[in-house]
Amino acid sequence: MAFRLIVVAALGASLALTGCDDQQTDRAVQKLKDFFNAVKPDALLLKGLTPGITTEDQIRSQMGKPETERAFTDGSKRLEYPRGPQGLNTYMVDIDRDGKLSAITQVLTAANFAKIHAGMTEDEVRRLLGKPGEIARYPLKPETVWSWKWLEGGVTQEGFFNVHFGPDGKVYTTSRSDVIRGR
């Protein structure tokens, strides 16, 4: 079934590209690559990436366009690759100042969730956990809740880690909630 979907998508894309000029074709091809990178299994997404050897260009070619890119004063970079909104992983890819891979870290872990504390800003949380899978605003409370689906293990396996921000944009608490499955 998944293979059929890929074949149909590729056929549709090739038909759409037949009447395009080069610039339109390049944009369409890039969008198609971004789509396939977004649905690519993690094992293929990360295959063959070697710290100290793999270049930033090779990473971008294999993993696609990052959700966020942060440049640091020492010349290094961090690329954010969330596998959501319903994915269970977010990868932070660190590039050294020479443009080589230095580390890949899956950040949706209990250890990282434990680092979230009252008073943190939205940017500080985003730097640590990446893009949330869901954002809910509750104007009457007032609060904004960011949620990440993750593999927590235990009885339910998957759960949501939630960060609650007050009207000042700062964390005031965290919580967890179950993933509700169909009945």
Give the location of each predicted region.
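A cross-family detector of function-defining hotspots
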Residues: 25-40, 45-98, 120-183
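C-terminal motif of bacterial Sec signal peptides marking the signal peptidase cleavage site
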Residues: 16-19
